UniProtKB/Swiss-Prot annotation:
Residues in the signal sequence: 1-22
Pfam families per the UniProt record, alphabetical: FSAP_sig_propep (PF03032)
Residue ranges of the propeptide: 23-50
Subcellular location: Secreted
Molecular function, one GO term: toxin activity
UniProt entry keywords in alphabetical sequence: Amphibian defense peptide, G-protein coupled receptor impairing toxin, Hydroxylation, Secreted, Signal, Toxin, Vasoactive, Vasodilator
UniProt-listed GO biological process terms: defense response; vasodilation
Protein name: [Thr6]-bradykinyl-Val,Asp
Entry GO terms, CC: extracellular region
Amino acid sequence: MSFLKKSLFLVLFLGLVSFSICEEEKRETEEEENEDEMDKESEEKRESPERPPGFTPFRVD
């Protein structure tokens, strides 16, 4: 019985460790994707011409 308890605890511990490693990798990839999106947005802002705040090119009166 003691052998079963030890092996069960070992399996659960190893499963928890592998799960935490997977979560960490997932978090890192999400952060990289967010950084890429932010870089794209900043590039788009740099390429667009400067306009005063509140300016809209299509005004409907």
